[in-house]
Amino acid sequence: MDYKLIDLHCDTAYRMYKEKKPLRSNDLHIALDKASGFKKYVQVAAVWSDNTRSDEEAYSDFWRILNNFKMEIEANRQSAVLCRSFDDLTQVPDGAAAFFLAVEDARLVSGNVERMHELYDADLVAAGLCGVAAGGRIAVVTAGAAAAACGHAQRHGACHQRCE
């Protein structure tokens, strides 16, 4: 097939972790066997923050969920590729799924700019503010904008181009 699909949001990483399901094949919305029918498949995988948890608990949960998802990508590296940029995306072979990482409900940052650096360094490219954190509104912060806003480019100097 020559079909191409870009899906800008899924909570599959959260559910995979909570329900102990693999990325290769599962009964969730996203699985590599389901994506295999597309010549090009791009997925933004959002790590969801459970709003019943405190900001600190959500922050700890985030790292467990993210690490689990990255391990699944690594275990399936022939058919799943983690991307941080358009350049990364152009290197993904036909038939492989390209994943970009995001966080949904960035309240787990909890006003701590250093956490924005940590998210950026952990390969996240977007953070959504929703629910309580945004007063019911949705806002998206891209990694480049977040890096510029928090001084990431100045702090790391040489990575200025990467941040933009």
List where the protein language model places each region.
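N-terminal hydrophobic targeting/anchoring segments and the immediately downstream early-domain regions
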Residues: M1-A148
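Loop-centered beta-sheet repeat module
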Residues: I138-E164
